[in-house]
Amino acid sequence: LSAEAIRAALKGLNITDLGDLKDVAPDVLLKEMLIEYIKFSFAFRYEEKIRMKRNPEETERLLEKMDKYISNELHNNLKLEDIKTMDFGHLQASEVVKRSLEDAYKVFELFYGEA
């Protein structure tokens, strides 16, 4: 998941080679990596559960909507202080990650029913 999150964050920031990194603030890169990690984690944790009650096309559509929700929510509400205290070597144990995944799943249940 971490490698996928890094790749997606670099793509989202239009970083195609190492030279591009000098134009991106470290906190911006870390925030993007964290957001992508949470998006991938949500899909990893819940895709199979969602797919049990829905067809593959609907599952993909719902996961795309949740990706957008997670991205918007974290871009608007994730604070630099939250990122500075995180151990990026153990993201799965992070309170920010746990809380974000729990909140996203609650929103999913509210709008789309139990997975």
Where does each model-flagged region fall?
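Alpha-helical oligomerization segments
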Residues: 44, 48-115
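Short runs of predominantly hydrophobic/aromatic residues within well-ordered alpha helices
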Residues: 2, 26-35, 39, 63, ...
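Long amphipathic alpha-helical segments with strong coiled-coil/leucine-zipper propensity
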Residues: 1-34
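Short alpha-helix boundary/capping elements
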Residues: 6-14, 34-42, 46, 70, ...
